[in-house]
């Protein structure tokens, strides 16, 4: 399995424009022909192209410098130098491109095949034929080609998913993802099994499909860089809503309501916009709950707060079909609301 890398810094440079030529016509019966130096070719651009066949920025960890081809110099007989070839770099769909110096977002590549020029090639210099005037019919100079643009840029990958699974480590998100989809994330009964986001596709039928992302477990102070969560919070930003998974197997270890509120605090501290994302609550591990009456109390609490509540066991499959329908219903509700706002 390829290593997941979601943030890199690379250097890009457009090709230099070719120099203009200094040349004169030399024909049999015109020993003193006019200026005939052609223009230099344009330098190649550096272009990023989004592709769904890539899922990580790992390649850029090993190669940091990307320079497009230079334009060729102009030639005699007013012949134009060949343009430098553009350098095409493929990046995963969902890549945000920023200027490393200013932090300005250059482009956000969210669609298959979307392109972004990150460094333009320099213009070719004009040949001496361009500088002929009535008073100077034989200019002996031409223009140099311009340098290509160069800069350091930051590539940040934000996964594109419809639903983000969030919750503390060990809430059972990976097992839930494998139940809902065909994804096969690492699953073990200890915190931080998931070291990178996992994506899976939930198919209710051929028309109803949702992409679900399992975001590695957050802990308190994740927004400050504690644990693993801070590295992956950006992946939640593109989701339409969150499925907040809480572990109800052992109320003594971490009270579910406290766990829910602690995670929401982290989202709020990282980005107030994130905390406002719609959420549903998924109470997981009900198979290990000895007193099921506690579930009714939890459901009452969350419904009073305005959250939809689903009780499931990712391990046994109990409640999973109801959750699938609930996820789709929530997705449709948000999608319809967004469509209404656009029109």
Curated annotation (Swiss-Prot):
Q: Where does the chain bind Mg(2+)?
A: 174, 194
Predominant location of this chain? cytoplasm
Gene Ontology cellular component annotations, sorted alphabetically? cytoplasm
Can you state the subunit structure given in the record? Monomer.
InterPro entries from the UniProt entry? G_OBG, GTP-bd, GTP-bd_Obg/CgtA, GTP1_OBG_dom, GTP1_OBG_dom_sf, OBG_GTPase, P-loop_NTPase, Small_GTP-bd
List cofactor names only. Answer: Mg(2+)
- Annotated Obg domain residues: 2-160
To which protein family does this belong?
A: Belongs to the TRAFAC class OBG-HflX-like GTPase superfamily. OBG GTPase family.
Keyword Nucleotide-binding assigned to the entry: answer is yes
Which cysteine pairs make disulfide bonds? Answer: none
Q: Report TM segments.
A: none
PROSITE patterns named in the record: G_OBG, OBG
Q: What does this protein do?
A: An essential GTPase which binds GTP, GDP and possibly (p)ppGpp with moderate affinity, with high nucleotide exchange rates and a fairly low GTP hydrolysis rate. Plays a role in control of the cell cycle, stress response, ribosome biogenesis and in those bacteria that undergo differentiation, in morphogenesis control.
Listed name of the protein: GTPase Obg
Enumerate the Pfam families for this protein: GTP1_OBG, MMR_HSR1
Residues binding GTP are 167-174, 192-196, 214-217, 284-287, 313-315
Q: What is its EC number?
A: 3.6.5.-
């Amino acid at each position: 399995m390829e290593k997941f890398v979601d943030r890199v810094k690379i250097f890009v440079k457009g090709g230099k424009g070719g120099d203009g030529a200094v040349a004169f016509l030399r024909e049999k019966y015109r020993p003193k022909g006019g200026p005939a130096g052609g223009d230099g070719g344009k330098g190649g651009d550096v272009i990023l192209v989004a592709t769904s066949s890539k899922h990580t920025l790992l390649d850029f960890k090993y190669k940091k410098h990307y320079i497009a081809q230079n334009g060729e110099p102009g030639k005699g007989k007013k012949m134009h130098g060949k343009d430098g070839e553009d350098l095409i770099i493929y990046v995963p769909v969902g890549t945000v491109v920023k200027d490393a110096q200013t932090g300005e977002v250059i482009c956000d590549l969210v669609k298959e095949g979307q392109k972004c020029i990150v460094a333009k090639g320099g213009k070719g210099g004009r040949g001496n034929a361009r500088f002929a005037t009535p008073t100077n019919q034989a200019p002996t100079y031409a223009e140099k080609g311009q340098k290509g643009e160069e800069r350091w840029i930051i590539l940040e990958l934000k996964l594109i998913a419809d639903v983000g699974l969030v919750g503390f480590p060990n809430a059972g998100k990976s097992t839930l993802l494998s139940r809902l989809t065909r994804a096969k994330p690492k699953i073990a009964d200890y915190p931080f099994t998931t070291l990178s986001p996992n994506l899976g596709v939930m198919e209710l039928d051929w028309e109803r499909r949702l992409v679900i992302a399992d975001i590695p477990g957050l802990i308190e102070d994740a927004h400050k860089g504690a644990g693993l969560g801070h590295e992956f919070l950006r992946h939640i930003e593109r989701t339409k809503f969150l499925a907040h998974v809480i572990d109800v197997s052992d109320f003594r270890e971490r009270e579910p309501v406290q766990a829910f509120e602690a995670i929401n605090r982290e989202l709020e501290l990282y980005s107030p916009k994130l905390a406002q994302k719609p959420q549903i609550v998924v109470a997981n591990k009900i198979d290990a709950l000895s007193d099921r009456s506690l579930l009714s109390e939890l459901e009452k609490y969350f419904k009073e707060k305005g959250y939809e509540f689903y009780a499931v066991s990712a391990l046994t499959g109990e409640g999973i079909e109801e959750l699938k329908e609930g996820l789709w219903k929530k997705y449709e509700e948000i999608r319809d609301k967004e469509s209404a706002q656009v029109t």
